[in-house]
UniProtKB/Swiss-Prot annotation:
The keyword Protein transport does not apply. The gene is nagK. It catalyses: 3-fumarylpyruvate + H2O = fumarate + pyruvate + H(+). Involved in the catabolism of gentisate (2,5-dihydroxybenzoate) a key intermediates in the aerobic pathways for the metabolism of a large number of aromatic compoun such as naphthalene. Catalyzes the hydrolytic cleavage of fumarylpyruvate to form fumarate and pyruvate. Its cofactor is Mg(2+); Mn(2+). A divalent metal cation binds at E41, E43, D72. Its EC number is 3.7.1.20. PANTHER family: ACYLPYRUVASE (PTHR11820), FLUTATHIONE S-TRANSFERASE (PTHR11820:SF90). This is Fumarylpyruvate hydrolase. Keywords: Aromatic hydrocarbons catabolism, Hydrolase, Metal-binding, Plasmid, Pyruvate. Pfam families: FAA_hydrolase. It is an enzyme of class 3 (hydrolase). Belongs to the FAH family. Pathway: Aromatic compound metabolism; naphthalene degradation.
Amino acid sequence: MGRPVDKSVEQAFYFTKSPQTLVESGATVAYPPRTSNYHYEMELVLAIGKPGFRVSEDQAHELIYGYAAGLDMTRRDLQLVARDKGRPWDTGKDIEEGSVCSEIVPMQGVVVEQGAIALEVNGQTKQSSNVDKLIWNVREIIADLSTYYHLQPGDLIYTGTPEGVGAVVAGDKIIGRVEGIAEISLTVGPAE
């Protein structure tokens, strides 16, 4: 996110989200509490279809059920405070109705290696990139994550966002897409 990564010395890192963060594409969600800097992050989402633990990169495709387009909405102000203090990012990332997901497109065993990924806010392009620019590709993510957890059918893995993240306000309409996968939409409603 906004800085170069040397994969030879840095490891991928992950965070988890509670089930109540998941919301279907097309929803209107309230601007969340305790933030004044709510950001979009457009992502390719992969859906796990078979259990796996300590899976090699060569076997990673065997766990793939399919893909979706997703939005990882973030309380950026809270995330940055936590990051700078070396604390967990939970309050910045684990937001009710903050994980927007399209329908899952079944693509068993397929490894998506490229495809345009884009996001618009109120008709203006904010993110435009390609899946081939992911820091860690789909095979690497599955293999690495499976060294920490027993991956299970139904697990959704958001794979990271391209450059161009930014803030939204109540009333904004977000449309995102991953080429060959799906399109998603979200309207940001007023705060509760």
